[in-house]
Amino acid sequence: MAAAKAEFTEHGLAGARLNRIAINAKASKERLYSYFESKERLFEAVVAQWISDAPYQVPLSAEDVPGYVAGLFDNIVADPQGARLQRWIELEAPDGMFDNHLLRRIFQAKLDEVRRGQQCGLIDPAWDPKSLLMLLIDIAYSMAASGFSIDRIVGEPLSERTLADRRNAAAEAARRLVGVS
């Protein structure tokens, strides 16, 4: 599974090649096909393992939405390979992949918590819960992952201070976003 995760993280579902996975896993391509049936099924297995193993399952509490975003930020910084895999999932997940899937249950629980927060007056009810959740996730991702690219473009080394500032900015953006007007 490690070879498959590395391949999908690097190339996505469309660009991944079972022959490279087989070589890196020291297995035969035929054996992979016999076990997983298709590249899509192998991708689904990699995603399922990553979701169940990942510390990415940061709990969302309506009482501490900034803490949720800060926790996501921390996990993205700690596991850039997982963050990259998440983006490939968003871009290339096959139709039906999430039927009865752990990821669906995780996100449904987060949406339920957003709705609870809206009902309790902790989160601005003007937001569509799905749109708000996507924004919160993308704030964490943008500040954690995209910032690395900006630092490289402008030729500045990434410091602990910069990471702390970005984490704080992400949490503050979340606080302002959910504020009740």
Features from the language model and the residues they span:
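Helix-turn-helix
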Residues: A3-R41, A45
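Amphipathic alpha-helical linker/stalk segments
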Residues: E10, E44-G71
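Short coil/turn segments at alpha/beta junctions that flank glycine-rich nucleotide-binding fingerprints
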Residues: E10-A14, D79, C120
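Ligand-binding pocket scaffold of soluble enzyme catalytic domains
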Residues: N19-R20, Y35, K39-E40, Q49-A54, ...
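Amphipathic alpha-helical packing segments from all-alpha helical-bundle domains
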Residues: P55, P59, D95-C120, K130-M134
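Helical hydrophobic small-molecule/effector-binding pocket
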Residues: P66-E90, D95-F98, I137-F148, G179-V180
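C-terminal peripheral helix-coil segments that are non-catalytic and often amphipathic
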Residues: D74-A78, Q108, D112-C120, D138-I139, ...
